[in-house]
Swiss-Prot record:
Pfam families: Caprin-1_dimer. Its main location: other. This is Caprin homolog. Residues 384-393, 766-777, 812-838 have a biased composition (Basic and acidic residues).
Length: 961
């Protein structure tokens, strides 16, 4: 009995479990149907189609009988049908709850486990009831028949309960393991499904690409003929492919009658699905299976791959674009062919284009290299000793090299001369170098008897009488100075190796020179149309053709040096600016003395005044050949008046070529004869200089210091002689009545370099400083570099104008408005003994004063005046000379000399210039020594010392005046 009761209990439990399972199944079915109804919301039936999105699902809802009759409008749903049945509220609630519950996958083990658990619970209840019966029975009460039979089954209930628990435990374990396996299998299935789907999509894309490729006529032709590795196809097969291509195209409707895009897409999808799945359904005359096989054969042939690879290498890339985007027009093949032809034509042209570009670059580099080679050749020519003069535009110094030359002393210097303003200027470049072996000088017209070989100025203007100021006046380089002075100048104005430049282009200059450039135009305007013209060797007159020399004064001897082997070449291109290099003139033995007027006219002058134009042509001297002097060729000079220095003695202070014969000695001997003439000329010049007083600031205007009476020591400086000659010429032009008597002899560099201590002249510094034009206007006659005041010109020693002031290098403007002359002999008028700022005072003590006039004030020694008893002496370095306190505190060396400013006085000051009416700006070349006197009194604002010791006269010049 008990066992039967237990069995019944277990059976009832199982039945209950099954009923629960059935109930769950029904619930799940209902929930699925409800979810289907929710999903069907918004589903629309596409007109003309039997199946709409979600319509088929909606019809499964058993609660909606009307859903089967869905109208063509596609707006009906199962939910609406339910509303029609009066169950809208309930259906909606059930649908929402069903949507919220996510159904789990059905697991039978779980269902079985649940059933067993329920049975176990029932067995436990029955066990409890039976235990109660047993307790009643044990208490002595009598049980009913049913109760007694139930208590008899107590042991069976316990056995069933234990069995159920064991079964539930094992089922639970199996269920967990089954779940794990299911998950793994699900992942595998998903992966396989993904691969399968990807393969299908890939196959669809392959089919589309094949169809697009067949739009190319060339491709179709190759497949029809079986060429180029293509599989041979029949026309029927091609027609089949074309049909499939047309039917699988998806198009947007263009009119209301057109099929919708969704319908065409659905049809295309079905065709692709049938093809990729190789369904046996027929398509045209063949099945989809055969159609799929046809596409596979075309792909496996590899023709299409080759077709794309070849165009990339040989043809235009456009071919691949056409075949990849197939428009269905069947024209992409032609485009590809055309593109390939064009590409073939273009590819060969690319190397030629590159070659052309490379050739152009090579030519450019060759041109640059040629210029560099030419530039190097010019530098080599400058460095070699041969004295070949090259065109100025090739020799024009560059700014960088000029700056570099500030640090380096270049032995080879290029002499650049002022260009002639009008016509084709023919600059003469004198390349100065150590004495080379004598060379035959090029054939030249007979030069003037007194040619300044080292003078860069072409005096053809003197012959033509049209000497006009340079059209564009550049800062004058201090032109060729005596060897000793050159070193000093180079320290201040470094002259770099000349580099070729365009014709007519002057190289950039040093800052002092550039400063002068700023004021060059006013100077040019003052000078008028005066011009420098440089003659080539062929244009120069031979000495034989010149007029006979004037009678020489007693004791005045000329020593002629042999022609220098330098060659002068004249470029045909105009030089825009007047340039004087800071080079010393190589000493030269002058030709036998010619007539005084001619000699003075031929003497070198950095600035030619318009007065030369006024001079009649017959008085114009013939051009002088300006050549670099060679120290070796200088003859021994008589009675040295310099400081123990010989003409070629480089150790005299600076290692340079021989000093230039100074014109001073000639003047000294001629002074007495010419004093009356010079006085008369001076008066004439004063009248003429007033209009050109500004010219006192001539581009090379050197303060009286340039004229320091070092001329005994500086006799070798041809620059001094040339300047004096030019000023004499100017004087001669202006005062044609009394031509200055030419010096009979160039006391060659021996005199300048002579070591005679008695003269005390610092011959060592044979440097003709060309004062910057701004210095030109020193107060006294000394002021202007180019002052016409013969006395101001330290060249003017012998000039007949009687300018006593040799102070100015060449004061063309004669004391700016003749103020120097008019103001009590401040400038040029100062007679001997005045503080003539000698560019190179010959005397330390005035001992070399030939006339004894300058003994008092005149000696401004170029180097040291300390020894000179002269009060006014200016020393190049230390103006220890007595006389006024030097204005040049800024000078390189302090000049304690009286009037004399030190060689390098303040450079920038306008004071001296302004006093004299000079430009007024800072000195272009730098006011080298502003005259110790400040240029106020004396004209001595010299190139080196613009000392206003206008009264300082070169010893020789003093006598001249």
């Amino acid at each position: 009995m008990p066992s039967a009761a237990n069995t019944a209990t277990v059976t009832a439990a199982i039945a209950t479990t099954v009923a629960a399972s059935a109930s769950n199944t029904n619930n799940n079915s209902v929930s699925k149907e409800k979810r289907s109804s929710i999903i069907s919301l918004g589903g629309s039936v596409i007109p003309g189609t039997a199946v709409a999105a979600g319509a088929g699902v909606a019809t499964t809802n058993g609660q909606s009988n009307s859903s089967a009759a869905a109208t063509a409008d596609g707006s009906q749903t199962d939910l609406a049908s339910s509303n029609n049945n009066g169950n809208a509220a309930k259906s909606k609630a059930n649908a929402v709850s069903a949507a919220a519950v996510v159904p789990e996958p059905y697991n039978p083990l779980k269902q079985l486990l649940v059933t067993i658990e329920h049975k176990i619970r029932n067995l436990e209840k029955r066990k409890t009831k039976l235990e109660s019966y047993r307790a009643i029975q044990s208490s002595g009460k009598e049980l009913s028949g049913d109760q007694a039979s139930a208590v008899a089954k107590y042991d069976a209930v316990l056995a069933n309960l234990e069995f159920a628990r064991e079964l539930a435990k094992h089922i639970q374990q199996q269920s967990k393991e089954a779940e794990k396996e299911q998950k793994k299998q699900a992942r595998k299935d998903n992966l396989a499904k993904t691969i399968a789907e990807t393969a299908k999509i890939r196959e669809v894309l392959i089919i589309q690409n094949v169809l697009n490729c067949f739009n190319d006529d060339q491709v179709r032709s190759d497949f029809l003929n079986g060429e180029n590795g293509a599989k041979k196809l029949e026309n029927t097969e091609l027609e089949l492919l074309e049909k499939f291509f047309i039917e699988t195209q998806t198009r947007r409707p263009e009119t209301a009658d057109d099929v919708s895009f969704i319908a065409t897409a659905q049809k295309s999808a079905e065709l692709f699905y049938s093809t990729i799945n190789a369904r046996p359904k027929s398509f045209g005359e063949v099945s989809f299976e055969k159609l799929r096989s046809l596409f596979q054969q075309i792909q496996d042939s590899g023709y299409l791959d080759k077709y794309y690879l070849v165009p990339l290498a040989e043809n235009a890339v456009a071919n691949s674009t056409d075949s990849g985007t197939g428009s269905g027009d069947g024209e992409s093949g032609d485009l590809l062919n055309d593109g390939s032809g064009e590409l073939d034509a273009e590819l060969p042209s690319e190397p030629s284009a590159r070659n052309s570009l490379e050739e152009g670059l090579d030519k450019l580099h060759l041109g640059v290299q040629a210029e560099l080679d030419q530039h190097q050749s010019y530098q080599q020519q400058q460095e070699r000793p041969s004295h070949l003069l090259e065109p100025q535009h090739q020799r024009a110094p560059s700014l960088e090299h000029q700056q570099n030359s500030m640090v380096q002393q270049v032995s080879t210097q290029v002499y650049q001369a002022a260009p002639q303003a009008g016509g084709t200027t023919t600059p003469v470049h004198v390349l100065y170098a150590p004495a080379p072996p004598a060379q035959q000088q090029p054939q030249q017209p007979p030069p003037h008897p007194h040619q300044l070989l080292s003078s860069p100025v072409n005096l053809q203007a003197l012959q033509t009488g049209t000497a006009a100021p340079p059209a564009q006046q550049q800062q004058p380089h201090p032109t060729h100075f005596a060897p000793n002075v050159r070193a000093v100048e180079q320290n201040y104005f470094k002259q770099p190796p000349q580099h070729p430049q365009g014709p007519g282009i002057q190289a950039p200059q040093t800052p002092q020179q550039q400063q002068f450039m700023q004021h060059s135009r006013p100077l040019a305007e003052v000078l008028g149309t005066g011009r420098f013209h440089f003659l080539q060797d062929s244009e120069l007159d031979n000495p034989e053709a010149l007029a006979p020399p004037p009678p020489t004064n007693q004791g005045l001897v000329f020593e002629q040096q042999p022609q220098q082997p330098n060659h002068v070449e004249e470029p045909t291109q105009a030089i825009l600016t007047l340039t004087f290099t800071n080079q010393s003139f190589p000493s030269q033995q002058p030709q036998p003395q010619q007539q005084g007027p001619q000699q003075q006219q031929q003497l070198f002058s950095p600035v030619l005044i318009h007065e030369q134009r006024q001079q009649p042509p017959q008085q114009q001297p013939q051009p002088m050949l300006i050549m670099p002097r060679l120290p070796t060729q200088q003859p021994q000079q008589p009675a040295p008046q310099g400081i123990g220095m010989q003409a070629g003695d480089v150790t005299s202070g600076f290692s340079y070529e021989n000093a230039v014969v100074s014109y001073e000695q000639q003047i000294q001997q001629q002074l007495k004869q010419q004093q009356q003439q010079q006085q008369q000329q001076q008066q004439n010049l004063q009248q003429l200089d007033e209009p050109s007083s500004v010219n006192s600031s001539s581009s090379v205007g050197a303060g009286g210091d340039v004229e320091n009476n070092e001329w005994h020591a500086r006799n070798n400086d041809t620059n001094a002689a040339a300047t004096a000659a030019l000023t004499n010429v100017l004087k001669g032009e202006t005062t044609q009545a009394t031509p200055p008597a030419p010096p009979t002899k160039w006391s060659s560099e021996m005199n300048a370099m002579s070591s005679a201590a008695s003269n005390g002249s610092s011959n060592t510094s044979h440097k003709q400083e060309w004062a910057t034009p701004r210095d030109h206007s020193t107060g006294g006659g000394n002021s202007g570099y180019a002052d016409n005041n013969e006395s101001n010109n330290h060249w003017n020693n012998s000039q007949g104008d009687g300018r006593r002031n040799s102070g100015n290098y060449q004061r063309r403007g004669g004391d700016r408005d003749n103020r120097d002359r008019d103001q009590g002999g401040r400038g040029d008028e100062r007679r001997n003994g005045g503080d003539r700022g000698n560019y190179r005072s010959r005397q330390y003590g005035n001992s070399s004063n030939t006339n004894g006039r300058n003994s008092g004030n005149s000696s401004g020694v170029y180097f040291r005046n300390n020894e000179s008893g002269n009060g006014g002496g200016n020393n190049y370095y230390q103006n220890g000379g007595g006389g006024g306190g030097t204005y040049n505190k800024e000078s390189r060396y302090e000049s304690s000399g009286g009037g004399g400013g030190s060689y390098r006085g303040q450079r920038g000051g306008n004071q001296q210039r302004n006093v004299n009416g000079s430009y007024g700006g800072g000195r272009p070349m730098g006011d080298r020594g502003r005259g110790g006197a400040g240029n106020q009194g004396g004209g001595g604002g010299g190139y080196i010392n613009r000392q206003n010791q206008s009264q300082r006269m070169p010893l020789g010049l003093e006598n001249k005046n």
